[in-house]
Curated annotation (Swiss-Prot):
Example of a GO MF term: DNA binding
Name of the gene encoding the protein in the UniProt record: foxc2-b
Organism, scientific name: Xenopus laevis
Tissue: After the mid-blastula transition, expressed in the dorsolateral mesoderm but not within the dorsal blastopore lip. During gastrulation and neurulation, expressed within the dorsal mesoderm and the lateral border of the neural plate but not within the dorsal midline. In neurula stage embryos, expressed at the border between mesoderm and ectoderm but not within the notochord and neuroectoderm. From stage 25 to stage 32, expressed in branchial arches, head mesenchmye, neural crest cells, tail tip and in two segmented lines of cells bordering the somites.
Keywords: Activator, Developmental protein, DNA-binding, Nucleus, Transcription, Transcription regulation
UniProt name for this protein: Forkhead box protein C2-B
Record lineage: Eukaryota, Metazoa, Chordata, Craniata, Vertebrata
Length: 461
């Protein structure tokens, strides 16, 4: 066996360990073989077969005789009773006749008679399709007859007892009878369909009128550009400025062509690539505020202070003094829309260069362009912005103040940088008579409350 297992001619050529392992292997096998030997004397089929044959032998022959008859038939108790009644000669049968018919036809019901016979009695008494007929005195016997209701013969589909249409009710049967009678009369008589014609015509009229109402409302609500419909309805008036901003706003306010909070916010949030002289005109006219701004001294001052305040509230890093912020700025690309905006701002005034607010409007334009420069993300001002004496002079028709042409001292720059926050506290009488934006800034009262006994006076410096 060692030679057959390892395919070696000489078993002595193997080592000690394989030899010992083989010896242990065969020794263990011999042990299990000796244990299995006495068990094989009495095999399993010899021990259990006679006992099983003796205990289950009498019932085995009966199961092979009729295995299919012991399966419950797929019919309900109502179907079984109906079969028994229909197979009777007079279409009526007693309760015992029903029992006998079921047991003769289906061997499954030969067992457990008490259970299914009780169910048969319940179905006879609870279903309206079964009618109890009293027994005639001429025929001897006990118990009444059971028959089917004449209207319940069609309760099974196509005569199959496996499927019933619905539970039979006498009320439903009487209604079906009436419907059948009406249909039969309608076929025979002619005026009955003529009476139904007005109802049919009314239905047609209702169907023709009903779709007109939603069509009319949809046309009125979704009118694209109607002149009278868009002006009369409140929804169209509310949506007119949002749909056509460039056309409706200049018609309503032909004289309002100045600056507003929306104008400064639009100039500040426009992208860097669009900062050219041409798109500055539709940008300002399209986003002008709905409230007109008349160019008087009081309204222009309040608008200017409101613009500064709005720029401060929306973004805390923007200040209104362009001279204070120009200290930290460097070079700037030269394609700016400020020169064209300055020319438009001065040309659109009512009195031209004779307006007392000419220099203030120029200051506001420069300030709005300054906000636009600082909002584009870390970019710096243009060279003409840093050197106003050399580069702004080429703009004809513009007069700049002496304080714009010269740099202030260091203290004034930081002072104006701080006073940019205080622009919301300016009143109309402080700004009305001034033509330069620096003077109302210096005379503005401080909005801070100092806890020290002395107050910080801005006008000293």
């Amino acid at each position: 066996m060692m030679q057959a297992r390892y395919s070696v001619a000489d078993p002595n050529a193997l080592g000690v360990v394989p030899y010992l392992s083989e010896q242990n292997y065969y020794r263990a096998a011999g042990t299990y073989g000796s244990m299995a030997t006495p068990m094989s004397v009495y095999p399993a089929h010899e021990q259990y077969t006679p006992a099983m044959a003796r205990s289950y032998g009498p019932y085995h022959h009966h199961q092979q005789a009729a295995p299919k008859d012991l399966v419950k038939p797929p019919y309900s108790y109502i179907a079984l009773i109906t079969m028994a009644i229909q197979n009777a000669p007079d279409k009526k049968i007693t309760l015992n006749g029903i029992y006998q018919f079921i047991m003769d036809r289906f061997p499954f019901y030969r067992e457990n008679k008490q259970g299914w016979q009780n169910s048969i009695r319940h179905n006879l008494s609870l279903n309206e399709c079964f009618v109890k007929v009293p027994r005639d005195d001429k025929k001897p016997g006990k118990g009444s007859y059971w028959s089917l209701d004449p209207d319940s013969y069609n309760m099974f589909e196509n005569g199959s007892f496996l499927r019933r249409r619905r539970r039979f009710k006498k009320k439903d049967a009487s209604r079906e009878k009436e419907d059948r009678l009406l249909k039969d009369q309608g076929k025979v008589q002619g005026p009955v369909p003529s009476l139904e014609l007005p109802k049919h015509e009314k239905k047609i009229i209702i169907k023709s009128e009903s779709p007109e109402l939603p069509v009319i409302t949809k046309v009125e609500n979704l009118s694209p550009g109607g002149g009278s419909a868009m002006q009369d309805s409140p929804r169209s008036v509310a949506s007119t400025p949002s749909v056509s901003t460039d056309s409706s706003i200049p018609e309503q306010h032909p004289a309002s062509n100045g600056f507003s909070v929306d104008n400064i916010m639009t100039l500040r949030t426009s992208p860097h690539g669009d900062l050219s002289p041409v798109p500055a005109i539709p940008c300002r006219t399209a986003m002008v505020s709905s409230l007109p701004i008349n160019y008087t001294a009081h309204t222009q001052s309040s608008v200017y202070s409101q613009a500064c305040t709005q720029s401060m509230d929306t973004s805390g890093s923007f200040q209104c003094s362009m001279r204070a912020m120009s200290l930290y700025t460097g070079d700037r690309p030269s394609h700016m829309c400020a020169p064209s905006t300055l020319e438009e701002a001065t040309s659109e005034h009512h009195n031209g260069t004779s307006s007392p607010l000419n220099s203030m409007s120029q200051e506001s334009v420069l300030t709005s362009s300054h906000h636009q420069q600082t909002a584009t993300g870390g970019q710096t001002a243009a060279p003409w912005y840093l050197n106003p004496g050399a580069d702004i002079g080429h703009l004809s028709g513009h007069n700049f103040g002496s304080q714009q042409q010269t740099f202030p001292n260091v203290r004034e720059m930081f002072n104006s940088h701080r006073l940019g926050i205080e622009s919301s506290a300016l009143s109309e009488h402080q700004v009305s008579g001034n033509t330069n934006c620096q003077i109302p800034y210096r005379s503005a009262p401080s909005i801070y409350r100092h806890s020290s006994p002395y107050a910080y006076d801005c006008t000293k410096y």
